Amino acid sequence: DWMMEDIFAKLYDMTAFSNIIADPSFLIMYAIAFILLYLGIRKHYEPLLLVPIAFGVLIANFPGGDMGVIQADENGMVMVNGVLKNIWEMPLHEIAHDLGLMNFIYYMLIKTGFLPPVIFMGVGALTDFGPMLRNLRLSIFGAAAQLGIFTVLLCAVMMGFTPQEAGALGIIGGADGPTAIFTTIKLAPHLLGPIAIAAYSYMALVPVIIPLVVKLLCSKKELMINMKEQEKLYPSKTEIKNLRVLKIIFPIAVTTIVALFVPTAVPLIGMLMFGNLIKEIGSDTSRLFDAAANSIMNAATIFLGLSVGATMTSEAFLNWTTIGIVVGGFLAFALSISGGIFFVKLFNLFSKKKINPLIGATGLSAVPMASRVCNEIATKYDPKNHVLNYCMSSNISGVIGSAVAAGVLISFLG
């Protein structure tokens, strides 16, 4: 009956149980995956992002499944079947064959920096710059929220991260997944997994984080400032005559200006504005718009989500660096929100026309999530006080702001 025992031993080896019992840290990763799935499915927090990421985390952590992304070290060296190889010198078919599907997607589409700008094109196609152009003076608060990025950068350097790692860590404060990924690839590729997870998780947790920070920093009286009444009391002098023409000129002008001043931000801003331009031109480019906003955007999101999730293997994730990144990312996030709020408070000290501090809190680029959350807070205190359109203007300028901040970091530290 040794035959039977042999067969059972073989069957047991085939399963993942032996490895999981030998290394229970996998169980922590399953727990993280299930929490993220719960947030995405039951709580409806950014399901389009959280569900693919969480599922990526889940499938990456079954030993023997070969779906985890293998992290190359700083010099690009990885273990392939017991041999050290340089990942950048391996042909793609070899990566696919030896390291599996996820590594193929990851090294081809993400590490090369291909997907983030493509997703930005989709974001541009789905963004309406109208609210921002109508309230241009509010868009300055989108710039103020980038303070969190630079504050955390300084703190991280003091804590012993290299300037490059610190820059990648700080960009989490921009609350923008593709920007965080793009910056990290350029500055600290070995930290891509945890930084991407932190950026996307905090983006998804915007409905929890913004109210926390707002409760701490704003009085009820400030939250009840009604922007519409302020408009009536102090009407603005400038009136936009031809919004449609302006909306077409805007993406072209922004790209040109940003490209002249921060050329490293062009891959992100250029694609964002191109996506927006084909939307605003209208029927002549409607087919391009349709592709950018739907099929391309959706396919890119699937590949990005799954492979970013798959970078979260237990050995890559359960260490002090990662925990530092998760904590630092939270700080960057909270500081970005409070930076925007303080900027509004400062503005209100000197201006007759008051601004609701919630408009500072939406300087993050989690669009339109942050604006929706702030609108809910405002209507809770005063059901007639709708701030959505005003929030959108600082929210959307936050997208441009974080991409420009990324460009600045890349050119200084890269």
Positions of predicted regions on the chain:
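Alpha-helical membrane segments and immediately flanking helix-loop junctions
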Residues: 108-112, 120-126, 140-151, 161-191, ...
